[in-house]
Amino acid sequence: MLSSRLQFAQQTARKFSISAKDGSGKLSTLAVKVHGGSRYADKEGIAHLLSRFNFHNTGNKSALRLVRESELLGGKFESSVDREYITLKATFLKEDLPYFVNALGNVLYKTSFRPHELPESVLPAAKYDISVSETNPINKAEDLLYNVSFRKDLGNTVLYRGVEKVTLDDIKAYANKVYTKENIEIVGQGVNEADLKRFVNDSLIGSLPTGSKLAAQAQPKFFSGEARLSAPGASVAAIAVPVTKEQFATYEVLAKYLTSALSELSPLIDSAKLDKYANAGLFSLYVKGEDASVVAENIKKVVDTLKKDVDISAAKEYTALQLSLENAPIDVSNVKNVKLDKFSYAAVGNVAKLPFADEL
């Protein structure tokens, strides 16, 4: 009997990707990352709405009780969505791991999806997310770059804007599709891995249904193009380069190089980054300012410089250090030069004064 139970626990564990790193501190974090972000959405914004349903009423606990209990234990819950994941996160005192594993399991397995919650709580919260996002023109430029570079898949809009009607039944169906054993990664910080696996197997997470693995493996199709959005406030000119896995190291170094004192371009650039996914990535950089004419001059300087063969090898050690601090090590030892070729372009703000892509 014991042998059968052990075998069942081992089989259950194999369904999940579970990893944890222990530490000497008193605080722990636990993240359940579900491959159910916007790239997998069958309706625009549905992943965002499902994320906002997390930590509402479940079959055995009200949302108020769930929040109150966690606060009494000194913990908190968060739910977020991006292009790849819906992430349920808990922060808590280390000794309370069993409670928070069970709580996350209840949310994944037993969320009630009550009809009144959609108009009264979920939709207002989603509108708030949009209002916060739209205060920063860089977020607008990033959405445009993704849409131009990928169109579908990673190009799908993350936030729900009400363009396409999404019903409660749609959200329930999407939850059934993505909240399955094959689509979940569980990551703990300040957590003993053996304990985490044991508690997961004993929780409702272990009772989640099986389903189709959604994690994208095939490389998405890349495009290049231009998008422009007239909007009040600061202006942004941005470029993006779709990146294959083999190019991750080069563009990690480039992003760190361009935002450090090693590059003469760094004063002109607001931000630069590489977003990495299992099968592709997107490098993007953003020039931002209140004066659109200055933004136009600066983006032209940046692109003109990057079209030359730029030696970025001086940033390898700095990049390696930063990535190690982010727990995202990549071998950058072979990185030398980079030269900008095809790219996507987005202009936001006073677009009458911002250049077109063919002027860069």
UniProtKB/Swiss-Prot annotation:
Membrane topology, record value: Peripheral membrane protein
Main location: mitochondrion
Signal peptide region: none
Molecular-function annotations in GO: metal ion binding
Pfam family, one: Peptidase_M16
Presequence extent in this chain: 1-15
Source species, domain of life: Eukaryota
InterPro entries attached to this UniProt entry: Metalloenz_LuxS/M16, MPP/UQCRC_Complex, Pept_M16_N, Peptidase_M16_C
Keyword set includes Heme: no
Cell compartments where the protein resides: Mitochondrion inner membrane
Keywords for this protein: Electron transport, Membrane, Mitochondrion, Mitochondrion inner membrane, Respiratory chain, Transit peptide, Transport
Gene3D superfamilies: Metalloenzyme, LuxS/M16 peptidase-like
GO CC, any one term: mitochondrial inner membrane
Keyword Metal-binding attributed: no
Assembly, per entry: Component of the ubiquinol-cytochrome c oxidoreductase (cytochrome b-c1 complex, complex III, CIII), a multisubunit enzyme composed of 3 respiratory subunits cytochrome b, cytochrome c1 and Rieske protein, 2 core protein subunits, and additional low-molecular weight protein subunits. The complex exists as an obligatory dimer and forms supercomplexes (SCs) in the inner mitochondrial membrane with cytochrome c oxidase (complex IV, CIV).
UniProt similarity note: Belongs to the peptidase M16 family. UQCRC2/QCR2 subfamily.
Function summary: Component of the ubiquinol-cytochrome c oxidoreductase, a multisubunit transmembrane complex that is part of the mitochondrial electron transport chain which drives oxidative phosphorylation.
Protein name as catalogued: Cytochrome b-c1 complex subunit 2, mitochondrial
Species this protein is from: Kluyveromyces lactis (strain ATCC 8585 / CBS 2359 / DSM 70799 / NBRC 1267 / NRRL Y-1140 / WM37)
Organism classification: Eukaryota, Fungi, Dikarya, Ascomycota, Saccharomycotina
Gene label: QCR2
